[in-house]
């Protein structure tokens, strides 16, 4: 299957899975997580896997830029590292714009002033271009930030694909367990991050190998 067909298959599957989750699964899973799991600390810890990645990517790119100005020419593995960082930062930039565009409320209320949520207010839905942190649930930034670099590393280091698969699964489990995101947010963030990672890697790594 060539890249165009894979892209089309991804779009079709996203167009099916995300609306299906929003309509049939999101509220039930959030309600179950809130009532049964009570946000265990282990779930919160799993979401922290993502936290160091954006600042680390920014620092690595800044250092790489300074090194290039000093005459350094990166080899293949250095290009992999740079590509991973670029994919991550591109993905989270796009994610922020999509959060604003979709304006989805959160599963729970944790902001001041009070943000409307499913658990507290039975608020559920999208208010397009609303803006504000209380309307930023979709897509999941955590899943976007973990799947973008993983998509690059999946191609560059195929021997470690078990690790690359495990990382987003762990983050997703943490997000569901902590009731930080609806399942639909998680699916959407996964597609976004993967698309950014595959796209950046297809250009940068293929060009480097040429």
Question: Whereabouts are the PLM-identified features?
Answer:
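N-terminal transmembrane-helix/juxtamembrane module of multi-pass inner/ER membrane proteins
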Residues: 1-64, 99-111, 115-119, 129
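Membrane-embedded catalytic cores of phosphoryl/pyrophosphoryl-handling enzymes
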Residues: 2-3, 8, 118-210
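Residue-level signature of transmembrane alpha-helical entry/exit and packing/kink sites
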Residues: 6-11, 79-84, 186
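Alpha-helical transmembrane spans of integral membrane proteins, capturing the lipid-embedded, hydrophobic core
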Residues: 11-16, 56, 84-92, 190, ...
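Aromatic-anchored segments of alpha-helical transmembrane domains
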Residues: 16-23, 88-97, 168-180
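Transmembrane alpha-helical segments of multi-pass membrane transport proteins and ion-pumping complexes
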Residues: 23, 27, 92-96, 100, ...
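Hydrophobic, aromatic-rich transmembrane alpha-helices
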Residues: 60-71, 146-154
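Interfacial segments of alpha-helical transmembrane regions
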Residues: 65-101
């Amino acid at each position: 299957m060539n890249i165009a067909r894979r892209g089309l298959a991804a779009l079709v599957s996203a167009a099916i899975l995300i609306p299906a989750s929003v309509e049939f699964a999101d509220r039930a899973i959030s309600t179950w997580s809130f009532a049964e799991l009570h946000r265990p600390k282990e779930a919160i810890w799993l979401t922290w896997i993502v936290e160091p990645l954006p600042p680390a990517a920014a620092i690595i790119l800044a250092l790489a830029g300074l090194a290039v100005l000093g005459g350094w020419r990166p080899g293949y593995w250095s290009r992999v590292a740079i590509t991973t960082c670029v994919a991550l930062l591109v993905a989270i930039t796009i994610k922020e714009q999509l959060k604003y565009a979709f304006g989805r409320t959160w599963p729970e209320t944790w902001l001041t002033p009070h943000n409307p949520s499913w658990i507290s207010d039975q608020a559920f839905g999208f208010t397009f271009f609303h803006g504000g942190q209380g309307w930023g649930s979709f897509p999941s930034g955590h899943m976007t930030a973990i799947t973008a670099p993983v998509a690059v590393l999946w191609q560059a280091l195929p021997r470690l694909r078990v690790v690359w698969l495990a990382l987003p699964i762990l983050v997703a489990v943490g997000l569901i367990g902590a009731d930080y995101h609806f399942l639909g947010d998680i699916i959407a963030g996964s597609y976004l991050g993967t698309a950014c990672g595959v796209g950046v890697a297809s250009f940068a790594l293929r060009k480097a190998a040429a």
